[in-house]
């Protein structure tokens, strides 16, 4: 982005450099819940891909309940005070022309919250599938390569 602005408008600023990592933080942290929703997160499908639908549901439930939810809640718990500290102190970048830091830090607890909410949604969908009140599509995953 900085190179684009510099060459197009003959203008450069440290804020253009810093906005890049703000945008990266937003893309990663706010996009994580969407990645979970469409089941494109990283995992090893060597065994999972050969299991029955019911076994996949149980593995997903275990992973969501034992790992994803506790981790996201704990990370949000850790990130929230960091955000508040930056917000109340008005922490700024040490670079000349730099930006305030709290908007980028807000992406952490917001992203963890969104992944937690999506994790709860995934748990509800899997429990509904086990109760035969919701139909899940197990064919959207990419085949093993």
Predicted regions mapped to residue ranges:
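Alpha-helical transmembrane segments and membrane-interface helix-loop junctions
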Residues: 1-145
């Amino acid at each position: 982005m900085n190179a684009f602005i510099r060459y197009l408008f003959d203008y450069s600023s440290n804020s253009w450099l810093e906005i890049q990592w703000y945008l990266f933080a937003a893309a990663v942290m706010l996009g994580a819940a969407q990645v979970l929703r469409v089941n494109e997160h990283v995992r090893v499908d060597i065994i999972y891909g050969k299991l029955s639908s019911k076994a996949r549901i149980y593995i997903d439930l275990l992973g969501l309940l034992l790992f994803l939810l506790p981790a996201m809640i704990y990370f949000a718990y850790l990130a929230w005070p960091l955000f508040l500290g930056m917000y109340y102190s008005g922490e700024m970048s040490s670079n000349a022309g730099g930006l305030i830091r709290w908007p980028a830090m807000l992406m952490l607890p917001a992203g963890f919250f969104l992944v937690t909410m999506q994790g709860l949604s995934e748990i509800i969908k899997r429990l509904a599938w086990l109760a035969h009140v919701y139909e899940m599509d197990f064919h959207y995953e990419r085949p093993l390569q």
